[in-house]
Amino acid sequence: MAIPYLYTDYGEFLRREFPFKVQKISINAGFTCPNRNGEKGWGGCTYCNNQTFNPAYCRTEKTITEQLEEGKRFFGRKYPDMKFLAYFQAYTNTYGEVDEVIRKYEEALVVLDVVGIVIGTRPDCMPQALLDYLTGLNRRTFLMVEYGIESVDDGTLVRINRGHTFAETEETVRRTVDAGIRTGGHIILGLPGEKRDELVSRLPLTALKIHQLQLIRGTRMAHEYALHPEQFHLYTADEYIELVIDYIERLRSDLVLERFVSQSPKDLLIAPDWGLKNYEFTERLKRRMKERGAWQGRLADRREQTR
């Protein structure tokens, strides 16, 4: 049987949205998280070290405009006609006084060649006043709100110190989608003690980022691993490829998949270190999907047909 496609690709999604090439530029806008500052806990998520995904230009001593201009110079060398999405990535980018949060978004949007924004945040940090503003913003520019889901299991969410429940995720995702806003999610595969669950497929998300469990220096999870390594299963690249295929076969076929792995700096990464760049991993994943006769939604679509 011929396989019509393997998965719904993020690059294709962007090509449908824009008539030109676009690149996300990460921003550190000086936010924090409610599970870091004592409102809901201390220390943040047990797996998190924001240094793993902040480029060198993402420093809070620089303004949002300065960070974007540095990012534009970096990416624009290869594609002079490229446009950009301001990616509010570090920490919780809706957490703060609403007027101040809005000011930061508006600063990004007046930078030349910025054609939209992507906002990374938590499902328990979307006040209605801010969602009302974002509803209007969505009418005048490209907007995606990305929620850190990480797990659908409340026990796991407690263990990793997220400070919210999956029910809160469901409620906030639906509010955001009902407002007409493109809505993304992040999920971690391989968290300790967790079984695979496709509840995330029931959420009306536009896009999903999947990434592997990584042990990062300076995190509470790295300390837990040092004390109890038997509680963790660190996947080989081939094992993780099989896990990802099993997972995405059960996802909705129209859910845009932005990535399957994340990369951390070598000096911060404890394990697993596969020695693969993201594109190399993706090519191996595609090859294995073809070998298995697998595609996104294969089992999810079958379940829908039998209901």
Question: What name fits each language-model region?
Answer:
Residues 1-85:
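N-terminal [4Fe-4S]-dependent radical SAM core
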Residues 2-12, 16-23, 207, 215-307:
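Auxiliary Fe-S-binding modules of radical SAM enzymes
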Residues 23-27, 84-86, 117-119, 143-147, ...:
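Hydrophobic faces of well-ordered beta-strands that scaffold small-molecule active sites
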Residues 51-71, 79-98, 112-126, 142-169, ...:
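Core AdoMet radical
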Residues 75-79, 105-112, 132-142, 174-178:
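Acidic (Asp/Glu)-rich catalytic clusters
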Residues 111-112, 137, 167-185, 231-253:
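Alpha-helix-loop-beta-strand connector modules within alpha/beta enzyme cores
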Residues 124-127, 162-165, 192-202, 234-241:
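Active-site glycine- and acidic-residue-rich loops that bind
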Residues 153-154, 176-199, 211-217, 224-234, ...:
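Conserved strand-turn element in the central/C-terminal portion of the radical SAM core barrel
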